[in-house]
Amino acid sequence: MKIYTKTGDKGFTSLIGGTRVAKHHIRIESYGTVDELNSYIGLICDQDIALHDKQILKQIQDRLFTIGSSLASDPEKSKMIIPDLHLTDIELLEKEMDMMNADLPELRHFILPGGSNAISFCHIARCVCRRAERITVQLAGESTVDEKVNIYLNRLSDYLFTLARKIANDNKIPENQWIPRV
């Protein structure tokens, strides 16, 4: 299978189902941003973090491929069976956050990104996740998007924030608290 097809050379690409759209179409922007997020999560996995966290992140990467496939499909034409996102996927993120938060100091200030590469990559992924969520919410206003996708992305950004705090705590790295000037 060739990687290049030359069919996108004029600025158009195909959705799953065959519909041709401009490469700047919001549906392309949505799944492209999810793909970008998945790459950053891979970067977090490459850091020296707890094995359990890596295992959860690998599950998240799998779910992001599910989301990307769903977003890359023309809801009117796709006959391909796309894996579904389940409520249990969202519940897993919530359960993991609850477990991490049980061991973290109470959050009293905003946290500035930084402290280590792993922490910073979590914050970058969190920001990309928020962007993916904004784009898919916009897409949902124009086309069919499974509502669990936006819920998952919302929880995932919270999970990534909490994971950044956990990594700081695990490595005894003080959190960079934002103390506003008055």
Tell where the protein language model's regions lie, with residue ranges:
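Phosphate/pyrophosphate-binding loop motifs in nucleotide- or prenyl diphosphate-using proteins
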Residues: M1-V182
